[in-house]
Swiss-Prot record:
Taxonomy, superkingdom: Bacteria
Protein name: Small ribosomal subunit protein uS13
UniProt similarity note: Belongs to the universal ribosomal protein uS13 family.
Record flagged with keyword Transport: no
Gene name, Swiss-Prot/TrEMBL: rpsM
């Protein structure tokens, strides 16, 4: 296992796929990073030289926000929206979908488990 940005990147995978194990790096970003370092995207992580690993680490640390820094920034943005009580912040507070999705029949994941409402009781005979 190679460590990049405090994440164990699997050695048996291709470099481009291995980089996607880092939070904040998707396939397109991984491809750009590989082009900058001039590493083939089809090369396996275990075949990378020490120099190439150092180059990957330095580019990721200098140009991209990943892992803890990115998570912290996202959480601070959500907290700021909650504090100023804008529409998106209110949706976060109420645990409802933020980006305009319908909630009449869907949004079970966001709203939580359905709560049963008791109907009219039948009289006993």
């Amino acid at each position: 296992m190679s460590r990049i940005s405090n994440v164990n990147v699997p050695t048996n995978k291709r470099v481009m796929i291995g980089l996607t194990y880092i939070y904040g790096i998707g396939r397109s970003t991984a491809q750009k990073i590989c082009q900058e370092v001039q590493v083939s995207v089809n090369k396996k992580v275990k075949d990378l030289s020490n120099q190439e690993l150092v180059a990957l680490r330095s580019i990721i640390e200098s140009k991209y926000k990943v892992e803890g820094d990115l998570r912290r920034e996202i959480n601070l943005n959500i907290k700021k929206k909650k504090d100023i009580r804008c529409y998106e912040g209110l949706r976060h507070i109420r645990k409802l979908p933020v980006r305009g999705q319908n909630t009449h029949s869907n949004a079970r994941t966001r709203k939580g488990k359905a709560i049963a409402i008791a109907g009219k009781k039948k009289p006993n005979k």
